[in-house]
Regions:
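N-terminal positively charged helical leader segments and presequences
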Residues: 1-106
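Short active-site oxyanion
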Residues: 22-24, 43-47, 139-141, 165-167, ...
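Short acidic-hydrophobic, aromatic-tinged amphipathic segments that line or gate anion-handling sites
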Residues: 27, 69-73, 167-176, 234
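Structured adenosyl-cofactor binding patch, chiefly the S-adenosyl-L-methionine
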Residues: 34, 39, 134-135, 156-160, ...
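Short, acidic/turn-prone active-site loops that include or flank metal/cofactor-
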Residues: 52, 73-76, 146-148, 218, ...
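Short, glycine/polar-rich helix-capping loops at beta-to-alpha or helix-loop-helix junctions
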Residues: 56, 148-154, 220-229
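RNA substrate-binding interface of SAM-dependent RNA methyltransferases
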Residues: 106-196
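Active-site/ligand-binding-proximal alpha/beta "capping" segment
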Residues: 118, 189-242, 246
Length: 262
């Protein structure tokens, strides 16, 4: 008599997420998991937790009808990368669907700037930018479908809960996105070290206008064609000994300046 494999297939489908399949992904870390559980628009499949971490979540409504597997800390390695700082929590979810750019522009409160990322691929940077957008009043963060970081557990953890509240959409064509924003009367401002205008000086002249900031990847910065489509190119005034900023730091400074001067 051969061994049946059915007993395995009946178990909860805890799978290590991959960059090739985004139908389901694993979120991890306390703030990321707590925020996802509190988001009624997030499709959730199951929760993996240590007993202590599960107790810390408290009595969230969605925990009452959610499959929960209480495990030891070492068991997370079966589902997550060994470098994932999970804090005793992992949540299997479907990636968020924020709809189309048109949906966003037609339904979102236009108060607050939009941040566009031109080939920013590092998930830690993108997550940090989304976090800054929530804290400093950014309306949304937009990027390129093929050249910006996708939603992953690491990105969502870096956003520290903000990912569930700040729209993050990607589009196939950044140039077309810029055209769409211009049609909606947004002023397009590119951040670039070669910009002839200082960021704060420009913002003082753009009060009560809709603004979209574009930031490029570290190293290469904004692409040539992206620069050509901007209404303005500006630089952040820094000390000469520090003329290149991390893109997430640059985004935070830009959003703070916009909040203060727009």
């Amino acid at each position: 008599m051969t061994k049946s494999k059915n007993s395995k297939t009946k178990q909860p489908n805890f799978k290590r997420s991959s960059r090739q399949n985004f139908d389901k992904i694993w979120l991890f870390g306390f703030h990321a998991v707590q925020a996802a559980l509190s988001n009624k628009n997030r499709d959730i499949f199951q929760l993996l937790a240590t007993k202590n971490s599960l107790d810390k979540l408290g009595h969230l409504t969605r925990l009452t009808d959610l499959p929960i597997k209480v495990v030891k800390p070492t068991e997370f390695l079966k589902y997550l990368d060994e470098k994932s700082v999970h804090q005793g929590l992992a949540l299997e979810v479907k990636p968020l669907d924020w709809g189309s750019i048109d949906d966003l522009l037609n339904t979102q409160n236009p108060i607050g700037p939009i941040v566009i990322l031109d080939r920013v691929k590092d998930p830690q940077n993108v997550g940090a930018i989304i976090r800054s957008a929530e804290v400093l009043g950014g309306q949304a963060v937009l990027g390129s479908t093929h050249h910006c970081a996708k939603e992953t557990g690491g990105l969502v953890k870096a956003a520290s809960g903000a990912f569930e509240r700040v729209p993050y959409l990607t589009v196939p064509n950044i140039s077309r996105l810029i055209e769409t924003l211009m049609e909606k009367e947004y002023t397009i401002v590119g951040l670039d070290p070669s910009g002839e205008t200082i960021l704060v000086d420009l913002l003082k002249s753009l009060k009560n206008q809709r603004i979209a900031f574009i930031l490029g990847s570290e190293g290469s910065g904004l692409r040539y064609l992206t620069k050509k489509r901007c209404d303005h190119l500006v630089q952040i005034n820094t000390r000469q000994t520090l003329n290149v900023l991390n893109v997430s730091n640059a985004a935070a400074i830009t959003l703070f300046a916009a909040r203060e001067f727009l």
